[in-house]
Structure formats: structure tokens, C-alpha cells
């Protein structure tokens, strides 16, 4: 019982000192937050579903490569994406089919 009260008191003291630090150094913290990089990954998110007939550029986006990638790079990218999305490991069968379709399209068409 006493140990719990001591822990609660120490917790409240820590929160109080933390809040005091933040309030006193608010300008410094704000400047530091502005210096942090903006989350660029959210801005480059592809906002759209799959096309009816997959294009070479869509296949490249699915695999995370350029449309003019070499066959070795296509194979490596397919392997990495399939390891993460394989249906036997909890991935979606639909996404796995699209990934395989993208690989087949990239390997069959010439840039």
C-alpha cells in the first residue's frame, strides 16, 4: 500500500517537472520541432486502386521499381514484395496475384 503511494507521488512529481520543463523551454522545443523533416512518405502515397488492365507503370509502382528496370532488379523486387505479402504468411491472395501479374508484365514487355 505504501509502496503504491510512493510510486504515485514520484509519478506525479515527474509529470510536474516534465511539464515545467516544457513550459519554460517552449520556444526552443518549437524551433526544434520545425527543424524536423516533414513526413515525405505520406505525400508520395499512391491514391488509387488497380486499373482494369495493368500498365507497365502500374506494375513498376506495385514492385517499387522504375518502369525501365533490368530483369535482375525485377526478380529481386518481386521476391521482397512477395515475402511480405505471401498468402501462406497472412498476406492477401488478391494482392499476391496482382504482384505476380506485375512481375509477369514487367518481364514480358520491353521498355
Curated annotation (Swiss-Prot):
It comes from Caenorhabditis briggsae. Residues 25-111 are mitochondrial matrix. One of its GO terms (biological process) is protein import into mitochondrial matrix. It comes from the Eukaryota. This is Mitochondrial import inner membrane translocase subunit TIM14. Residues 58-111 form the J domain. GO terms for molecular function: ATPase activator activity. The chain crosses the membrane at residues 4-24. InterPro entries: DnaJ_domain (IPR001623), J_dom_sf (IPR036869). Probable component of the PAM complex, a complex required for the translocation of transit peptide-containing proteins from the inner membrane into the mitochondrial matrix in an ATP-dependent manner. May act as a co-chaperone that stimulate the ATP-dependent activity. Belongs to the TIM14 family. Keywords: Chaperone, Membrane, Mitochondrion, Mitochondrion inner membrane, Protein transport, Translocation, Transmembrane, Transmembrane helix, Transport. Disulfide bonds: none annotated. PROSITE patterns: DNAJ_2. Residues 1-3 are mitochondrial intermembrane. It is found in: Mitochondrion inner membrane. One of its GO terms (cellular component) is PAM complex, Tim23 associated import motor. Probable component of the PAM complex at least composed of a mitochondrial HSP70 protein, GrpE, tim-44, tim-16 and tim-14. It is a single-pass membrane protein.
